């Protein structure tokens, strides 16, 4: 049998503990420091979750960059397998034309550089015209439609070596299956290097 003095001491010591336990139970769950309790579903999820796969795929937009083939100096042939040229996410190169993989807005661009030894002095010198054009062939238009076009005239002009560059680029609304190609006048004067002659497009 417990002595009366010791029983009274045990009751006195246990009273503060019971009071603290009661106060703790009266607090809301989030204030008790319980993990994941009382938090909204988004806050209770782990922070290392990966984004949905469909969002990651949506960032892979079609793009293409072609360079001129130096092995065909009499005609401008495009290639996509060398010198930082590429085809990505649906673009195809067929019959020297880019095939548009999906409908949407695209930035289309091209550059050519012409060079020559000089204009020969004559009483009536023959003009030398240079031109470069990006064309569209679509099911909506059964013929090649110019998208970008530029012309330059060199002769009569300088007696020494000359260089002329043409860069063009703009945004177009294209349809899946459209074909992008180029037409060039003055191909024997093309300076066929990857940094001088190129053609490409990318989705916005």
UniProtKB/Swiss-Prot annotation:
One of its GO terms (biological process) is positive regulation of chronic inflammatory response to antigenic stimulus. Disulfide bonds join 119-155. Glycans are attached at residue 95. One of its GO terms (cellular component) is membrane. Residues 1-33 form the signal peptide. One of its GO terms (molecular function) is tumor necrosis factor receptor binding. The keyword Secreted applies. Its main location: secreted. It comes from the Eukaryota. Keywords: Cytokine, Disulfide bond, Glycoprotein, Membrane, Secreted, Signal. The keyword Plastid does not apply. It is found in: Secreted; Membrane. InterPro entries: TNF, TNF_beta, TNF_CS, TNF_dom, Tumour_necrosis_fac-like_dom. Residues 62-204 form the THD domain. Belongs to the tumor necrosis factor family. Cytokine that in its homotrimeric form binds to TNFRSF1A/TNFR1, TNFRSF1B/TNFBR and TNFRSF14/HVEM. In its heterotrimeric form with LTB binds to TNFRSF3/LTBR. Lymphotoxin is produced by lymphocytes and is cytotoxic for a wide range of tumor cells in vitro and in vivo. Homotrimer, and heterotrimer of either two LTB and one LTA subunits or (less prevalent) two LTA and one LTB subunits. Interacts with TNFRSF14. This is Lymphotoxin-alpha. It comes from Sus scrofa.
